[in-house]
Amino acid sequence: MGWRLITKKGANLSEIIPGSQIGNIQDYHRHRYKQGIPEGVKDLPPGVALPLESNLAYMNGISFTKGCYIGQELTARTHHMGVIRKRLLPVQFLAPLPRDSIPEGAEILTESGKSAGKFRAGGGDLGIALLRLANINEPLCLNIAGDKVKLTASIPEWWPKPASK
């Protein structure tokens, strides 16, 4: 996710890290959405979001050796069985959307109208959605005020690569 520095007030960051740029909060969220990184209750709704579907194991956010946390048995069993059908993924729209035009939890559909997942959050032309992995290479869309809005999903580069057989 980049660098986070604590420096003395007035420090010249381009001297500390040559070629670096200082971003604002919108830059941070765009970068986060491009990488498929969830943050907070909008991306991880309490009582709804599951740790493995939210890629927390990929980010070392789950311990499979520590016990005694709520959902630990289900999480460990699912991880070791290897069947995770949905994951949070970065999505991109063909054009930037008006701010707050997509309701949280809006259903994402395949071209044939079958449910592919749910939109979690986004801004401009980027977002994050919980999608069925079987549908990520298909054309996807959202219905917004009666209009079909097309979007594409992608697998982030930082995800572990599947083992070759």
Task: Annotate each language-model stretch with its function.
Residues 41-66, 77-78:
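A short, contiguous structural element within a folded domain that forms the immediate neighborhood
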Residues 35-48, 159-165:
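Short, low-order "capping/linker" segments at domain edges
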Residues 5, 71, 113:
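Residue-level signal for inorganic ion chemistry
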Residues 3, 14-19, 42-47, 73, ...:
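A short secondary-structure junction signal
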Residues 1-38:
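Acidic, low-complexity central loop/insert segments
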Residues 54-60, 76-165:
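Glycine-rich, small/acidic residue-mixed loop/short-helix segments
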Residues 11-12, 37-40, 81-83, 97-98:
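Short, catalytically relevant binding-site loops at active-site mouths
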